[in-house]
Each structure stands twice: as C-alpha cells, then as structure tokens.
C-alpha cells in the first residue's frame, strides 16, 4: 500500500514481491513476465487529481556541494529556475493516457527518472530524498503501474510511444526542463527515444543498467501494466537516433554482470546477463564525447542495492552541466581509463 501526501510528498510503502525490471531480450534464462498490476481504485490516492497546478514563482538555488552523501563538487555559480508549478503529486492526462507524476524540489536541470519495466515510483524511494535535495526531481508511473490507471484496451506498446507519452505528460504538467534524464533498465530505451525526440530539453543523461539499442538479437515481448511491450520495435525507436555530442553522459552498471541478479541480490532471482548486454553498456559510452562509465557494487536494481552510486552519478552530471566542465569521477571513486569504480 502506498500513501501519497501532496504537501510533503512523503511516501509510506510496504514493499513485497519482486519487480521485474530487466528486458527479456538481453537476458538468458528469463522466466515469464510478472502479472500486470491492477489499475488503482479511484480513491486509492486522495492526492491525485487532474486539475492543473497553479504557476509557481522563480527560485534561486546554488550548485550542489561536496558531501559524503554523494553530491558533486560545489560551484560558485547560482542557478535561477524558471517559473514552475509548485510540487506536483497527481494523475495527469495527456496524449490519451493518464499517468501519475510526482515533482518536487528546486533547481535546474530537472532530474527526470524513467523507471524500468513494470517498475513504479516506489522502487526509487531509497534515492528520491537525496535527488530532491540536489535539484528539482520528477518521477512517474507508466499506465497500469503504481498509481496510474491502466491503458484502455491494453494493446502493444513500445519505447517510442512511451517517450511520446512522457513528453506530453511533462508538457501538460508544466514541467519544461531542461532535464537530466535517468533511465533504468527498459527505461534506458524510453530515455533514448525521449532524447531523440526532445534533444533541446535534455541537458544530461544517466543510463543506470539501461537497455541499449545496440543489440536486438533476442526479440522478445514483455508484459507491463496490462499491455505488451514490443522490444524489437523499442530498439528501432532508439537505434538510429543522433549522438549526444558533448552532453554529459554517465553509463552506470552493476559490478558483477556475469553473476547479476534480477531485482538485485536481496530478491534472489539469479539471471545470467549476456555478452551482448555488457557490450551494449560499453557501446553506450560512444553516444557522447563527454561520457564516463561507472561500475557500482550492486545487482541490476542499482537504486535499491547501491543508492549512493545512483546519487553520485546524478551529482557528477549535475556538476558538469552547471559548470560547463567535463565529467569527472566522484571524489571517492577510483578512475581507471574512462571508468570510475566504487572503493
């Protein structure tokens, strides 16, 4: 059960079961997809509404400062955010679908979290407070997941459609960006499609164990929220996109991919990651000339098993965006060539 409180955006959660987050196309030995979640009851989220939020006022924030919690080195530059709505915690209808959106905090660029397959906002609870301290942060549930009602009629979907619906959601909610896009697992494909379609709205990227368009050797479908995600079509929606130029990019991956566990070690569902997955992670670094790889000490669900790695990855991208300097490893990371590793 999840309780949303609009004023404080705090969430009380009982986590159970295993979230199926990794795309079947890049895994071996993968079982059937998790059951599609039921659409939430109309009274399940008292804070949710489709009423537009009133405009907010400009806010000044300073760039993040270095702390043990994983924030990037400080900058003297002070950023002023454009006029924005106040904190958001509601269902927004746009592009014919309704999706639950939470946005909180101040600062620019806005951190935009794109969850993995069958994954809800709840899976990001370990990192949300720290990210909101760094900058404005938005996270959402796709149709049929978490607090978002199911898509009418179900049907087949793909990363391109999900990216279009995400862009419409943000526009309808008054979140104009620019965005630091954080794509996890299948969310990496959605993030790439979003970046291709909305390049002017993207300031930085973190691909956290992101599925990449560099391999389509196993064209499987995967259920999510009463729909079927067409993975081959999802690859096509991202594979021919433009490079990121000098846009800061962190490619964050688990430290033990050959023995990775779906959902992280705590969930105990071992899945062997293929060589194509590893190669795709490496190839993703070529998307930007300002990129670094980060190896985390975790399983696939980094935000659950190694929150600090996610927080620090976002922090170094924020610092690069705000100061206009090349990406560097966090202070306590070890640099080996173009890869940063946790101690």
Q: Where do the PLM segments sit?
A:
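Conserved hydrolase catalytic core segment
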Residues: 177-214
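Catalytic active-site module of serine/aspartate enzymes centered on a nucleophile-bearing elbow/loop
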Residues: 291, 295-343
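Active-site loop/oxyanion-hole signature of alpha/beta-hydrolase fold enzymes
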Residues: 142-180
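Conserved HGGG/HGGXW glycine-rich cap/lid loop of the alpha/beta-hydrolase fold
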Residues: 93-147
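C-terminal motif of bacterial Sec signal peptides marking the signal peptidase cleavage site
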Residues: 26-29
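Bacterial signal peptide processing site
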Residues: 31-34
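Conserved loop-alpha-helix segment in the C-terminal half of the alpha/beta-hydrolase fold
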Residues: 265-293, 343
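Flexible "cap/lid" loop of the alpha/beta hydrolase fold
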Residues: 206-234
């Amino acid at each position: 059960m999840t309780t949303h409180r609009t004023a404080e955006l705090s969430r009380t959660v009982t986590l159970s079961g295993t979230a199926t987050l990794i795309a079947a196309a890049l895994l071996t030995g993968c079982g059937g997809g998790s059951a599609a979640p039921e659409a939430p009851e109309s009274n399940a989220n008292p804070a949710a509404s489709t009423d537009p939020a009133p405009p907010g006022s400009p806010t000044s924030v300073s760039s993040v400062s270095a702390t043990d919690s994983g924030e990037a080195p400080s900058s003297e530059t002070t950023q002023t955010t454009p006029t924005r709505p106040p904190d958001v915690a509601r269902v927004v209808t746009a592009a014919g679908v309704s999706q639950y959106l939470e946005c909180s905090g101040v600062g620019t660029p806005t951190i935009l979290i794109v969850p993995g397959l069958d994954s809800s906002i709840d899976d990001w609870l370990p990192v949300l407070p720290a990210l909101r301290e760094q900058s404005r942060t938005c996270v959402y549930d796709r149709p049929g997941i978490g607090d978002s009602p199911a898509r009418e009629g179900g049907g087949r979907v793909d990363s391109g459609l999900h990216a279009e619906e995400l862009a419409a959601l943000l526009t309808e909610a008054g979140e104009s960006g620019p965005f630091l896009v954080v794509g996890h697992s299948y969310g990496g494909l959605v993030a790439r499609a979003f970046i291709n379609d909305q390049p002017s709205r993207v300031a930085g990227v973190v691909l956290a164990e992101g599925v990449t368009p560099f391999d389509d050797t196993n064209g499987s479908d995967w259920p999510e929220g009463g729909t079927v995600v067409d993975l081959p079509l999802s690859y096509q929606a991202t594979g021919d996109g433009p490079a990121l130029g000098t846009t800061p990019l962190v490619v964050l991956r688990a430290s033990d991919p050959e023995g990775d566990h779906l959902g992280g070690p705590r969930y105990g569902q071992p899945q062997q990651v293929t060589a194509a997955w590893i190669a795709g992670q490496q190839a993703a670094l070529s998307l930007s000339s300002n990129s670094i790889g980060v190896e985390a000490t975790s399983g696939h669900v980094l935000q659950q098993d190694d929150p600090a790695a996610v927080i620090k990855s976002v922090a170094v991208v924020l610092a690069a965006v705000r100061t206009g300097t090349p990406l560097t490893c966090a202070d306590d990371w070890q640099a080996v060539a173009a890869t940063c590793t946790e101690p």
